[in-house]
Amino acid sequence: MKQLLETIAKSLVDCPDEVQVSEVTGEQSIILELKVAPEDMGKVIGKQGRIAKAIRTVIKAAAVKENKRVVVEII
């Protein structure tokens, strides 16, 4: 999951070296925190949050395969 989010984010931004993904595991879910450079924040979120929503949808679909619940937070 973490690797998938990192790959997607790096393909969207201008500064792929500054992409960081951290994973926080809870009792029932996994929280993936995506950190990008401030100038790339708009590219990851997209107009009206469309790209962010698409990223979350892809990650959730991959999580369902593994019977897990994943939340993506963009920081």
UniProtKB/Swiss-Prot annotation:
Subcellular location: Cytoplasm
InterPro entries: KH_dom-like_a/b, KH_sf_prok-type, KhpA
Single GO BP term: peptidoglycan biosynthetic process
GO cellular component terms, semicolon-separated: cytoplasm
Gene3D superfamilies given in the database record: 3.30.300.20
Sequence similarity: Belongs to the KhpA RNA-binding protein family.
Stored PANTHER family: RNA-BINDING PROTEIN KHPA, UPF0109 PROTEIN SCO5592
Function text: A probable RNA chaperone. Forms a complex with KhpB which binds to cellular RNA and controls its expression. Plays a role in peptidoglycan (PG) homeostasis and cell length regulation.
Protein name: RNA-binding protein KhpA
